[in-house]
């Protein structure tokens, strides 16, 4: 799903933001599809849950994902991921 370069100068949360945005824009993650929980994604990637939470917060702020209390995070419908990748 996602690969991280732990030796990169780019922060891990930024790598997560970019990777998830790419998956959304390529259609690998469909609109309204539920994302993995913060804890499960952190465990799978071997990173701190706070790192994943920061990435999810950035994606939500940018409109790529949305959160539902008690349910999780989901892919937003619309072109937000493509705009984010283009730097707009």
Predicted features, each with a name:
Residues 16, 43-45, 49-50, 56, ...:
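Alpha-helix boundary/interfacial micro-motifs
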Residues 1-34, 40, 84, 88:
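Extreme N-terminal segment that seeds HTH/winged-HTH DNA-binding domains in transcriptional regulators
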Residues 35-66:
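N-terminal helix-turn-helix
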């Amino acid at each position: 799903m996602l690969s991280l370069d732990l030796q990169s100068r780019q922060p891990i949360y930024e790598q997560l933001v970019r990777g998830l945005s790419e998956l959304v824009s390529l259609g690998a993650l469909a609109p309204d599809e539920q994302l993995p929980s913060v804890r499960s994604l952190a465990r799978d990637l071997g990173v701190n849950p706070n790192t994943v939470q920061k990435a999810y917060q950035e994606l939500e702020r940018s409109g790529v994902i949305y959160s539902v209390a008690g349910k999780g995070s989901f892919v937003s419908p619309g072109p937000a991921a493509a705009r984010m990748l283009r730097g707009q």
